């Protein structure tokens, strides 16, 4: 049974009437452009065929009832008439409540909803299960009540909910690609203007995601440290963000910066340039150049931004040794564990899967999880 059938069946069973709509919003993988989003830079993600699905119906009162199918059918119920506050014990509820609370501040022309939520975006892998949930919930209200909100506004609403209500600092990329993703394309997103350009993916190329299953621990504290270091760098150049600093300007004065801050800045500036070039390489179908850019990106994350771990570096090395110059591989996501992403010809997928299965666990003591994904459509009815 797929997620649509599962949530519709559960909806009818629990609420006693049929859902009127089913909405999906995908997870994402970032092909290149890491830790550039909060520096007003560029990112190149694609939506993947793992998503959050919500079967839903409007109510004729001001109550929101939510069932989380993946959490033993836990229930959350709250009123649109009272101030929406955080839930004491159910963390998933706060993503839903936060989205609804922030929607009220944007456009209050909606009533209650019944919904059943289920998803298959792997959690804790850095594939944006939370952004997928936020965008799905926003799209539910937008579709059921015909709210005049576009994908970018639904994405911003989700980001606000996560930053201010859930209390987790995140850039805009994850929500934006979930809302705006395009089938068979990646999206070059300008995180300052929120402009997005669809970039066609070469035919016969697989998007492979391998979860290291190394448990991320440092991610929150280290993420905030990196943000502060980047802000320090921008202040040094008297610019609003590192987006506004050129590599030439940086190289001229790099020795005057704190050495650690200098490394962080160099990563962001070089990664921005790589990301813009990667979009044109992909569009031309130049997988070889894309592979070089992904390798440079990984080295920069490892050596300058210092966010990789030995397990991730091992995975990258195994994949690289198998594919040579036919495609690319790098860590993707915030760092300190999580996943690597590889762009490889479809006919090389079995060899890569076999090499990783034979070597990764033997070297690290951890078993990986292997996903082959398709660049998919952003949020909407399904």
Swiss-Prot record:
Residues the record marks as active site: 174 (proton acceptor)
Similarity comment text for this entry: Belongs to the GHMP kinase family. GalK subfamily.
Catalytic activity: alpha-D-galactose + ATP = alpha-D-galactose 1-phosphate + ADP + H(+)
Record-linked InterPro entries: Galactokinase (IPR000705), Galactokinase_bac (IPR022963), Galactokinase_CS (IPR019741), GalKase_N (IPR019539), GHMP_kinase_C_dom (IPR013750), GHMP_kinase_C_sf (IPR036554), GHMP_kinase_N_dom (IPR006204), GHMP_knse_ATP-bd_CS (IPR006203)
Site note Transition state stabilizer, residues: 28
Gene: galK
Compartments, record wording: Cytoplasm
Record-given protein name: Galactokinase
């Amino acid at each position: 049974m797929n997620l649509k059938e599962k949530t519709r069946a559960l909806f009818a069973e629990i609420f006693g009437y049929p859902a009127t709509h089913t909405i999906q919003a995908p997870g994402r993988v970032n092909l290149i452009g890491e830790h550039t989003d909060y520096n007003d830079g560029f990112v190149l993600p694609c939506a993947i065929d793992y998503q959050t699905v919500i079967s839903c119906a409007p109510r004729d009162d001001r109550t929101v009832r939510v069932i989380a199918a993946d959490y033993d059918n836990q229930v959350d119920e709250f009123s649109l008439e009272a101030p929406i506050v955080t839930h004491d014990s159910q963390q998933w509820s706060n993503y839903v409540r936060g989205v609804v609370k922030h929607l009220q501040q944007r456009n209050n022309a909606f009533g209650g909803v019944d919904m059943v939520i289920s998803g298959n975006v792997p959690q804790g892998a850095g594939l944006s299960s939370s952004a997928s949930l936020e965008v799905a919930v926003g799209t539910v209200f937008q579709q059921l009540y015909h709210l005049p909100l576009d994908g970018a506004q639904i994405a911003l609403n989700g980001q606000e909910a996560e930053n201010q209500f859930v209390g987790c600092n995140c850039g805009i990329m994850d929500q934006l690609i979930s809302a705006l993703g395009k089938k068979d394309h990646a999206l070059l997103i300008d995180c300052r203007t929120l402009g997005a350009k669809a970039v066609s993916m070469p035919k016969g190329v697989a998007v492979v995601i391998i979860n290291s299953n190394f448990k991320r621990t440092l991610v929150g504290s280290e993420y905030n440290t990196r943000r502060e270091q980047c802000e320090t760098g921008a202040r040094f150049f008297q610019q609003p963000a590192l987006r506004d600093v050129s590599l030439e300007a940086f190289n001229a004065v790099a020795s005057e910066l704190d050495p650690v801050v200098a490394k962080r800045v160099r990563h962001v500036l070089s990664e921005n340039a790589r990301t813009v070039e990667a979009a044109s390489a992909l569009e031309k179908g130049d997988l070889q150049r894309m592979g070089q850019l992904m390798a440079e990106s990984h080295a920069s994350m490892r050596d300058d931004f210092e966010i990789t771990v030995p397990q991730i570096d091992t995975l990258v090395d195994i994949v690289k040794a198998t594919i040579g110059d036919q495609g690319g591989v790098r860590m993707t996501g915030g760092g300190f564990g999580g996943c690597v992403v590889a762009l490889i010809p479809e006919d090389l997928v079995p060899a890569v899967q076999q090499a990783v299965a034979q070597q990764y666990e033997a070297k690290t003591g951890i078993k990986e999880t292997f996903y082959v994904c398709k660049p998919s459509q952003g949020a909407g009815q399904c």
